[in-house]
Design a protein with these regions (language model features):
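Hydrophobic "lid"/C-terminal helical patch
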Residues: 164
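Active-site/ligand-binding-proximal alpha/beta "capping" segment
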Residues: 77-112, 119, 170-178
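A cross-family phosphate/adenosyl-ligand binding-site feature
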Residues: 2-85, 125-157, 168-185
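Flexible, glycine/proline-enriched loop segments at strand-loop-helix junctions
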Residues: 92-93, 117-121, 148-151
């Protein structure tokens, strides 16, 4: 990770989550942004639940200070455990795994499989291009603009918590359109 801001903000977020009395449920890694978040949580004696597939045991990637460590057989099962146990999803800067997890919880929400807040933590404008790509998908007719209401974007740690605390639940049909008539589809 080239810019320290991603590590520093993740560690701060972890501390803040712990100080709120909330738990972090994550992929159990000790490296990168999520490793920094984990260190922030444990520095404040917070609850840190790691979920990892069995094959991670041999790769020396697991954070050893999780308050609970859950092992699964597959990556798919891992995501399912995290999705089921989470009350909200905060999407920090990350790579392909983060993108995949974001789009999975977004799709599940569109299909009314959960009604939990999804907050994209856009540190340093990291997700600006992805947000613009999604807007392009709307303007080109590939998805409804209602899909952009499935998640919120926070630029600061304070905004992350405000958006979770003030979450307004929308109800969508199976195609991602708002059921309350507040859509263009």
């Amino acid at each position: 990770i080239r810019d320290r801001i991603y590590i520093d903000t993740a560690e701060s977020l972890g501390r803040a989550i712990a100080n709120r009395g909330d738990a972090v449920i994550y992929g159990a890694g000790k490296y990168g942004v999520m490793g920094a978040t984990a260190r922030g949580v444990t520095s404040e004696k917070g609850e840190l639940i790691g979920v990892a597939p069995e094959f991670f045991k041999k790769d020396n990637v697991l954070y050893d200070k999780c308050t609970e460590l859950v092992f699964t057989d597959t990556m798919r099962e891992r995501k399912g455990v995290m999705e089921d146990r989470a009350d909200a999803f905060v999407i920090c800067a990350g790579g392909i795994g983060t993108f995949e997890e974001f789009f999975e919880v977004l799709t599940l929400k569109q299909l009314s499989q959960h009604r939990k807040p999804i907050v994209m933590y856009n540190v340093n404008g990291y997700y600006d291009s992805l947000i613009n790509m999604m807007k392009k998908s709307v303007s080109e007719g590939f998805m409804s603009d209602d899909c952009l209401k499935l998640f919120t974007v926070a630029n600061t740690e304070q905004e992350v918590f405000e958006q979770i605390d003030n979450y307004k639940e929308y109800t969508y049909d199976k195609y991602g359109f708002l059921r309350d008539g507040d859509n263009n589809g």
